[in-house]
Amino acid sequence: MNNNDESSFVFRQLFDKDTGTFTYLMFDSDTLEGLIIDPVKEQFDRSLQFIEELGIELKYAIDTHVHADHITSSRMLRDATGAKSTFGENSSVQGADIRLNDGDELEFGHFKLKAISTPGHTDACTSFYTEGRLFTGDSLLIRGCGRTDFQQGDPEKLFNSITQKLYAYPDSTLVYPGHDYLGRTASCIIEEKSFNPRIHSGQTLEKFVQIMNNLNLPKPKRIDEAIPLNLKCGFSLELGHVNEDNFTMHDLHQLLDKLTPTERVIDVRKPNEYDQGHVPGSLNIPMGNEREFIDEIRGYDRVFLHCHSGRRAQTVYTMLSMQGLEN
């Protein structure tokens, strides 16, 4: 537990109903530094809205493991906010900014998030602890645990991760899992030790391995799509990139002179930035609002995305590409 006053610790649990995935957003209200755990691609707009409305300086976008049932938005949040994409040390993810070893800590404001290596569901699962809360990803679930039949899963490793590491925390420690499909939101260590049918405190390794090896679960519906994308921080390199050429003012004027009525410059900055100066004739659609204007954008033969550094334009480009736009 951090010795600082917990009154400035702000915590939000978000949910994606289509995949049963929990996302966790937390920050220090004194400094506004924060982080997000297991963000979901389809909820990118919602996550960004919370971050912007609350004024959070997002330092880290964290994934507990390479997910098989949904696509992460950690790379998109990095592009949008400057946060560092973060995975466990054993992860083979390409492009991660930070790889955490067991015991590493991430600071946000007055608080620290501790990484706990908990392999078993996959070989690179990482749980996290801060302020009396454990974020267990798919390792320990409420009255259950993650499966161990793909991505180098290993029931013996999972048993040891839960019983030797997670169950070593005080009984009152709150447990926030990566998923739940029955409407439950949290548990605590003593509850899982007492009532978890797969891995209660009296469970033996042999019995646990037998249970896990005989689950015979169907493979996740999106596994063939999700794993390849999540190995790239959720960003599909096949979607390409916006043009990274540097434009001079002369280039910009030439572009504007050649624009036809069916072409448009879209400024994806915030309205206050747009008001301080913008490309003449450009349309202001702040990043995160592009879905509301998707039909209007489809109406143009060609659009040019503009922002201050190109990072937000990159993110909007990705979102529009995912919606099937090629203009």
What kind of region is each of these model predictions?
Residues 1-4, 160-174, 178-264:
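Accessory terminal helices/loops
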Residues 116, 285-327:
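Catalytic cysteine-centered active loop of the rhodanese-like fold, especially the PTP/DSP P-loop
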Residues 36-37, 264-269, 285:
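Short hydrophobic beta-strand that contains or immediately precedes a catalytic carboxylate
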Residues 26, 38, 65, 77, ...:
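Divalent metal-coordination and catalytic microenvironments
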Residues 36-39, 58-67, 85-90, 118-120, ...:
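Active-site neighborhood of phospho(di)ester-bond hydrolases with catalytic His/Asp-centered motifs
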Residues 19-20, 41-117, 318:
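Active-site HxH/HxHxD metal-binding segment of metal-dependent hydrolases
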